[in-house]
A protein has these predicted regions:
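Catalytic loop of the DD-peptidase/beta-lactamase superfamily, centered on the K-T-G motif
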Residues: 1-125
Length: 125
């Protein structure tokens, strides 16, 4: 578990080719290895890629280079290199119990993505 700020900094570092606050944390080649789409499926070595069927993220306007992670407990973090955008949404999906499906039922992640892209990248949409 972490904070939205920590995750935003981590994903911004990945967008910067492994560099953050003037310090090289990972080599650009390492970042590429973890974020480039696999030949075998929609995942990269470290993250999901859009081609894997994240229609809400794609529909929102994310580029095909977008990578990220959605987690069981409600974590949702995406980085869109083409649009220079980091998206972090932290929720407590498993409250009050692990069978809670309100995030999916209300399409919370997809609706949040859509609003971010509409307001920041496509204000006319």
């Amino acid at each position: 578990f972490s904070t939205a700020t920590d995750l935003a900094q981590l994903f911004q570092m990945l967008l910067n080719g492994g560099r953050y606050n003037g310090q090289q944390i990972f080599r650009p080649a390492t970042v590429a290895t973890f974020t480039n789409k696999s030949r075998f499926n929609y995942r990269a070595l470290g993250f999901d890629r859009l081609k894997g069927g994240w229609p809400n993220v794609v529909k929102a306007g994310a580029s095909e280079e977008t990578f990220g992670h959605t987690g069981f407990s409600g974590t949702c973090v995406w980085a869109d290199p083409e649009n220079e955008l980091v998206f972090v949404l932290l929720t407590n999906r498993i409250h009050p119990n692990p069978k809670n499906n309100r995030l999916k039922r209300f399409n919370t992640r997809g609706r949040a993505h859509l609003q971010v892209y509409r307001s920041l990248l496509r204000p006319e949409a």
